[in-house]
Amino acid sequence: MENIMNNPVIGVVMCRNRLKGHATQTLQEKYLNAIIHAGGLPIALPHALAEPSLLEQLLPKLDGIYLPGSPSNVQPHLYGENGDEPDADPGRDLLSMAIINAALERRIPIFAICRGLQELVVATGGSLHRKLCEQPELLEHREDPELPVEQQYAPSHEVQVEEGGLLSALLPECSNFWVNSLHGQGAKVVSPRLRVEARSPDGLVEAVSVINHPFALGVQWHPEWNSSEYALSRILFEGFITACQHHIAEKQRL
């Protein structure tokens, strides 16, 4: 039987909620299970680890960084806009921005989903559409909350993969495919540090990667949903874990 303690250690940024009046940090099972099924060992990262001295001690122990989706949104002041964000999670923002920049500097693999993609965009100098529904040229990218969860995560629209990038290398036989869509915000301006990897039919950025980094991929859809049942989703997670294994090998050579 495989010893899971030999698997790449993946740090997963948590989300803050309130449970029975208590501040609580949580992770949804679907994100954790997708990492386990792909051969990784997920480790929860509470927001207090944003403290620089703690983060400096933590990063050498991690083989990959995983930024999951969340009901919360990135605070607008982080990308140069005014106004409040009612669905904010400042602790997550603080940890995510710090850990993205540190991971990029150390060339640690990153896989970012939904809010995670938006964090990757903001951390590298880009900005977001705060309300996609107010952009008349864009499709409806939100889910219908009245539907059962299985239907909310059903395929919603196609994405077109850009040639020559990380996503096309992972999916060489698949230049377009259908994805689910459960987000109210999205990438507005993408930094020159990022490569656009895929777009939806309305032109909205659906995937990005960091240029000159071995594996730093963000996707706007949710491949973690029943990831073991869908070949395309499995390939993304397995590609991430493979990159983490390569990072381990690089660390051992130093």
Curated annotation (Swiss-Prot):
* Listed InterPro entries: Class_I_gatase-like, Peptidase_C26, PuuD-like
Q: What induces the gene encoding this protein? A: Induced by putrescine and nutrient starvation. Repressed by PuuR and low aeration condition. Repressed at the exponential phase and highly induced in early stationary phase.
- The answer to whether UniProt assigns keyword Mitochondrion to this entry is no
Q: Which GO molecular function annotations are given, in alphabetical order?
A: gamma-glutamyl-gamma-aminobutyrate hydrolase activity
The keyword Hydrolase is annotated on this UniProt entry: yes
Cite a single GO BP annotation: polyamine catabolic process
Source superkingdom: Bacteria
Which pathway or pathways does this protein act in?
A: Amine and polyamine degradation; putrescine degradation; 4-aminobutanoate from putrescine: step 4/4
Q: How does it assemble?
A: Homodimer.
Q: Which family does it belong to?
A: Belongs to the peptidase C26 family.
Official protein name in the record: Gamma-glutamyl-gamma-aminobutyrate hydrolase PuuD
Q: Which organism is it from?
A: Escherichia coli (strain K12)
